[in-house]
A protein has these predicted regions:
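Glycine-rich beta-alpha loop elements in corrinoid/cobalamin-binding modules
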Residues: 1-59
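A generic "binding-loop/recognition-motif" signal
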Residues: 22, 62, 92
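A generic structural signal for short, non-catalytic loop/turn and secondary-structure boundary residues
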Residues: 39-41, 62, 79, 156
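A short, sequence-level motif marking secondary-structure junctions
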Residues: 60-66
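Radical SAM [4Fe-4S] cluster-binding motif and immediate context
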Residues: 67-211
Length: 211
């Protein structure tokens, strides 16, 4: 939440809130409670209620290197016949006023080599669908083209891939790659919040409606 202190003030039953991306903060918090190491004041990314009843806030946690975040889908049987969610990037460069993602404008990526290696695990397990949760997958056109070509070349005839994209960002080369894919190999989800240009201006959303 963007207003962690405010939530603690109105919710006395809550003892604390993790802010931002939680991997590092959560690990340190678990270590603190289980092993008794350190103190809450030494864990970045926390807003918490102290023993004195006052609300304390530590500094923001550093953004993690996405390649260091563990891959959770190690056992193929655990996700057999399931939809799996996969994250190859974090962040958003846009500044839509209604979206918390606009606070952090930096976009970070998991390395392409690692992404392909992990997607291959899903392909070998023949999972029905891999759903990318990247906020706007086709921001980086070179990366988009490379991965879509790789997916087309490694199609197992079963698995399909779902992407959230900016339709107005699609290029002719990306469309050409899609045209040569097996029907249903990929799904594209397009968020069209409005078709009114005045609305876009009010919410600071960028979109080329003519495209």
């Amino acid at each position: 939440t963007w207003d962690a202190e405010g939530f603690l003030e109105v919710c006395p039953e809550m003892s604390g809130i993790m802010r931002g991306e939680g991997e590092e903060t959560f690990c340190r918090l678990v270590t603190y409670y289980i092993e008794g190491e350190g103190s809450l004041s030494g864990i970045r990314g926390l807003t918490y209620r102290g023993e004195d009843g006052r609300i304390h806030e530590t500094g923001d946690a550093e953004l993690p290197d996405l390649d260091r975040i563990p891959f959770l889908y190690r056992d193929p049987e655990a996700f057999e016949n399931r939809i799996v969610y996969y994250e190859s990037s974090r962040g958003c460069p846009f500044r839509c006023s209604y979206c918390l993602s606009s606070v952090e404008r930096r976009v970070r990526f998991r390395s392409m080599e690692l992404v392909k290696k992990e997607l291959n695990i899903f392909l070998e397990a023949r999972v029905p669908q891999v759903k990318f949760v990247d906020r706007t997958f086709n921001l980086d056109h070179g990366r988009t083209e490379e991965l879509w070509r790789w997916i087309a070349e490694h199609d197992n005839g079963v698995t399909n891939f779902h992407f959230e994209i900016g339709a107005d960002l699609l290029t002719d080369r990306e469309l050409e790659i899609i045209s040569r894919m097996r029907p249903g190999l990929i799904e594209l989800e397009i968020g069209v919040q409005s078709v009114n240009e005045d609305t876009f201006r009010e919410i600071d959303r960028t979109m080329d409606l003519e495209r």
